[in-house]
Design a protein with these regions (language model features):
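Secretory targeting and sorting signals
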Residues: 1-10
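Primarily recognizes the serine-hydrolase "nucleophile elbow" in alpha/beta-hydrolase
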Residues: 189-264
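Domain-level recognition of soluble alpha/beta enzyme cores
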Residues: 11-116, 334-341, 352, 361
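Alpha/beta-hydrolase active-site loop
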Residues: 150-219
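The feature captures the conserved acid-bearing segment of alpha/beta-hydrolase catalytic domains
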Residues: 110, 245-313
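Active-site machinery of serine-nucleophile hydrolases
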Residues: 59-62, 71-86, 127-168, 308
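C-terminal catalytic-base region of ester-bond hydrolases, centering on the histidine
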Residues: 16-21, 295-382
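Short substrate-entry loop that stabilizes the transition state in hydrolases
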Residues: 97-156, 256-257, 284-285
C-alpha cells in the first residue's frame, strides 16, 4: 500500500479477519511448490539462484483435511508490520494468519481443468488475491499464484528461510528489470507445471503432492490475471509466451514511464488473444495513455470494465479486510474506495469468471456484453 491514513484508536486484540466464502460448486484444495531455477541467477541477490514459491489451488475433495492460514506466520508478521506503518495502527491489530477456505493437500477432484496464473501487484504477496482465486477454483479452475522473490515483502521457503524484499531504489531501468524478471518467473512456472502434468514432481524438496493434482492440469487452456504490476506482467508474458490463451489486468499501468511514453511491448505490439482490463477510481483508458495505446494496437477480443467508486487496492483482499478495522471509512477511501466491499467482490468474481469461461471454456457470457443490474457498480467505458 502506498497511501497513508490518519491514526486509529489502538486495539488490544487483533481484528478477526475472514474472506467471503466461494460460491461455486467445488471445494478448494491448496498446496505449495518450491521451485528452483538452477539456470538463472537471482536478479536482486546475485549470489543466489532464482527460487520461487507458488501456491496451487484446485477443485478438491476435502474430507479429513484442514483449512490453511491466509499467510504463514513469518510472512504474516512482515506484512502486518508494513501495513500497520501505512495505516498508522499497532501491527498486533493485523492478524494475517486467519483461516481461509482452502484445504491443505486435499485430493483433487478427477478431471482436467483450465489453469489460471495469478501475479500479485508490485511489492505484494501472492496471498493478497485469495478471494478471487478461491472463487475461480470453486468454479472449476486450477489457480497458480506466484510470489516474485525479493520483491514481495517476504517469501518463506519450506526450510524456514525467509527472503525479504531486496529491490534497489525505483527507476525506469529497475522497473524494466522487475517486469522482465516477473515474465521469466512466469515462464519458468509454466515449464514446471508441464513437468507436473507429465507425472513428475517439480518441487525442489520432492515433497509429496496432493493425489490427482498433476492429472487435473489442462495446459491447453491457460489464462493469467494480475493486479497492478501483475496485470502488466500478464500482458508482457503473453507477448513472448503463446502458452497463455487469455489475460486480465486489474488496474495496472503498462508503462515504465507514462510521461516519456515508455510503454511495454504488450502496448506497442498489442496481442492477438483476448484481454480484459479492469480499473477503479480515476484510472481508466481515459486517463492512462498505455491503456489507450494498447487498445489501439490490440488485435483480438478486449473489454474495459470500471469501478468508479473503487480504488487501486479494490482488486485485492484489502477490499474486504480493511473495513473490519477501527478506522474511519473516509480514511480508507484512498486505498479501497467507497464501493460496498461485498458488492465489489461479488462483481469482480463474476466478471473474471465470465471472462475465463468465455475464452478458456468457450462458453458465451452475456454478462460481458454490457452493464448488468446485478452488478450496478461496474461500468463499461466506451
Amino acid at each position: 500500500m502506498a497511501a497513508s491514513v490518519p491514526t486509529a484508536a489502538a486495539s488490544p486484540l487483533p481484528v478477526r479477519f475472514e474472506l467471503p466464502a466461494p460460491t461455486g460448486p467445488y471445494s478448494v484444495g491448496i498446496t505449495e511448490l518450491h521451485l528452483v531455477d538452477q539456470a538463472r541467477q537471482d536478479p536482486w541477490v546475485p549470489t543466489a539462484v532464482r527460487e520461487l514459491m507458488v501456491t496451487i489451488r484446485y477443485p478438491a475433495t476435502v474430507n479429513g483435511t484442514s483449512p490453511t492460514p491466509f499467510m504463514s506466520p513469518a510472512v504474516a508478521e512482515v506484512t502486518a508490520d508494513e501495513d500497520a506503518a501505512t495505516l498508522k495502527i499497532d501491527p498486533a491489530e493485523l492478524d494475517y494468519g486467519f483461516t481461509t477456505h482452502s484445504n491443505l493437500n486435499a485430493h483433487a477432484v478427477p478431471g482436467r481443468r483450465p489453469v489460471v496464473l495469478y501475479s500479485p501487484g508490485g511489492s505484494r504477496s501472492r496471498s493478497m488475491g485469495a478471494s478471487l482465486m478461491e472463487q475461480l477454483v470453486s468454479e472449476g479452475y486450477v489457480v497458480v499464484a506466484i510470489d516474485h522473490t525479493h520483491e514481495a515483502p517476504a517469501v518463506e521457503f519450506p526450510d524456514g528461510r525467509v527472503a525479504r524484499r531486496a529491490l534497489p531504489p525505483s527507476s525506469i531501468e529497475v522497473g524494466k528489470r522487475l517486469i522482465a524478471t516477473r515474465v521469466q518467473d512466469t515462464g519458468f512456472v509454466l515449464d514446471q507445471l508441464e513437468v507436473l502434468a507429465r507425472g513428475g514432481n517439480p518441487d525442489a524438496g520432492r515433497r509429496r503432492l496432493p493425489h490427482g493434482l498433476g492429472r487435473s492440469l489442462d495446459l491447453g487452456r491457460i489464462g493469467m490475471v494480475g493486479h497492478s504490476a501483475g496485470g502488466f506482467t500478464a500482458g508482457e508474458t503473453m507477448v513472448s509466451d503463446r502458452r497463455i490463451d487469455a489475460g486480465a489486468n486489474l488496474d495496472g499501468s503498462m508503462a515504465y514511464s507514462q510521461s516519456a511514453r515508455d510503454f511495454g511491448r504488450v502496448v506497442n505490439e498489442g496481442l492477438d488473444r483476448p484481454f480484459l482490463l479492469m480499473s477503479a477510481g480515476n484510472h481508466s483508458a481515459a486517463s492512462d495513455p498505455s491503456w489507450r495505446e494498447f487498445l489501439t494496437n490490440h488485435r483480438a477480443w478486449a473489454r474495459q470494465l470500471h469501478l468508479p467508486e473503487g480504488e487501486h487496492f479494490t482488486f485485492t483482499d484489502y477490499q474486504v479486510l480493511l473495513p473490519r478495522l477501527d478506522i474511519d471509512p473516509a480514511a480508507l477511501a484512498p486505498l479501497i474506495g467507497t464501493v460496498d466491499p461485498a458488492r465489489s467482490t461479488a462483481a469482480q468474481r463474476a466478471y473474471l469468471t465470465a471472462f475465463f469461461d468465455q475464452h478458456l471454456r468457450h462458453r458465451p457470457q452475456p454478462l460481458l456484453d454490457g452493464p448488468s443490474d446485478r452488478y450496478p457498480d461496474v461500468r463499461f467505458p466506451s
